[in-house]
Structures are given as structure tokens and as C-alpha cells.
């Protein structure tokens, strides 16, 4: 279909940049090496091209082999990537490569998963590599990050079943984002879990 045009204000871009750097969001800092495995034209690579220079983080661009497991593992290891963002299929390809090759990604600390629901199995497999998985909801019209789930920091507060259920949702709205649920007539619905 036709591409959609979305206008961003300087203010929304700056606020979004600061929000993505917060600990319960993408937690980007000057200590990070970030590999955004999302195209620049897709919701601004989830804001990473703005957050990295503001934080003083190094940003590694993956080139045209964004979903190729061996290439990603090589980039992560050669560049010392600490944080990366991508859709579930990217992570499935990386994990399949790691599983079949026995290769490790020692520097990778966290991945942000968005674009579609992240399977619990992906999160659990990343756990075996010591990588924190953060589920997020992004949308072009939102500058783009809307919610982030950094539940791993609270893992010790829950039993395994409750933690598994909690970590597969998309989390809470980030700073500056307001959300509501409406019916078909745009009437706001109660926050009652139904």
C-alpha cells in the first residue's frame, strides 16, 4: 500500500529520546553499543538513532542482512554490542544460529522485542545466554515507542508462573504516553482487566 506520512515535532522527538533512555525503557547509556535491527524507515528504527548520540552510545548499523543469524552474531561479537532491538523473527534466526553453532554473544545484555508478540520460548532461550528480554509496543504515530516491559528487574518478586505471564505483555506506557481503551463508539472503558 501507500506509505503513511507522519509528522513529528521536535518536542516529541526530544521527549521520546529521553524516555527511551530511562532504565525501565530501553535503558540506553554511554556504556552501550546499540545494534538496531529495524530499518530507519520503520518507526525511525524505534528511536535509536536519536537516543544513541544523546546518551553517547555507539550505534552499529547492520546493513542489508538484518535478519541473518550468523551475520548478527558476528556483528554483536566484533562490535561488543550490549543492546539490540528487533522483531521476533530476527531473534528466532539469531537464536537458531547460536543453538546450531554453539557460538555465544558474551557482550549482549538486553534485547528489545516489538513489532509482534514475543514468544515466551524466545525470552526463556535468551535467559540461558544471560540476556534480558524487554517486550515493547511501538507505532509510527507514537514517535514510536509506546510501552515497555522491563519486568526482568522484578523477577525475584514473582513465582515462575506469574513471572512468565507478566513478561509476555507489552508493559507500561513510557514517560509522556497516555493510553486508554475504548469501545467501537470511542467511549472509554474501565480498567477492569476484562
Model region roles, listed by residue range:
Residues 7, 85, 173:
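Short aromatic/basic micro-patch
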Residues 2, 42, 175:
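Nucleotide-sugar-dependent glycosyltransferase donor-binding/catalytic pocket residues
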Residues 5-7, 36, 58-65, 134:
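Short beta-strand->loop structural element characteristic of the AMP-binding/adenylate-forming
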Residues 54-57, 78-86, 92-165, 178, ...:
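Gly/Ser/Thr-rich phosphate-binding loop
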Residues 1-16:
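Conserved AMP-binding A3 loop
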Residues 173-194:
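Conserved beta-loop-beta connector loops within the AMP-binding
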Residues 29-33, 106-108, 169:
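Short acidic capping loops at alpha-helix termini that bridge into adjacent secondary structure
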Residues 14-33, 43-82, 97:
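Conserved AMP-binding/adenylation subdomain of ANL enzymes
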Amino acid at each position: 500500500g501507500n506509505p503513511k506520512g507522519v509528522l513529528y515535532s521536535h518536542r516529541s522527538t526530544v521527549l521520546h529520546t529521553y524516555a527511551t533512555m530511562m532504565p525501565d525503557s530501553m535503558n540506553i547509556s554511554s556504556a552501550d553499543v546499540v545494534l538496531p535491527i529495524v530499518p530507519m524507515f520503520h518507526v525511525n528504527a524505534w528511536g535509536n538513532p536519536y537516543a544513541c548520540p544523546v546518551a553517547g552510545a555507539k550505534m552499529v548499523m547492520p546493513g542489508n542482512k538484518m535478519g541473518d543469524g550468523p551475520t548478527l552474531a558476528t556483528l554483536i561479537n566484533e562490535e561488543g554490542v550490549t543492546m539490540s532491538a528487533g522483531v521476533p523473527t530476527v531473534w528466532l534466526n539469531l537464536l537458531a544460529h547460536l543453538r546450531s553453532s554453539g557460538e555465544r554473544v558474551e557482550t549482549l545484555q538486553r534485547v528489545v522485542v516489538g513489532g509482534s508478540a514475543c514468544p515466551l520460548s524466545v525470552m526463556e532461550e535468551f535467559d540461558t545466554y544471560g540476556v534480558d528480554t524487554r517486550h515493547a509496543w511501538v507505532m509510527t504515530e507514537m514517535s514510536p515507542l509506546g510501552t515497555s516491559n522491563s519486568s526482568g528487574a522484578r523477577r525475584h518478586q514473582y513465582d515462575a508462573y506469574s513471572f512468565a505471564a507478566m513478561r509476555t505483555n507489552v508493559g507500561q506506557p513510557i514517560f509522556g504516553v497516555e493510553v486508554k481503551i475504548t469501545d467501537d463508539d470511542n467511549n472509554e472503558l474501565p480498567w477492569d482487566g476484562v
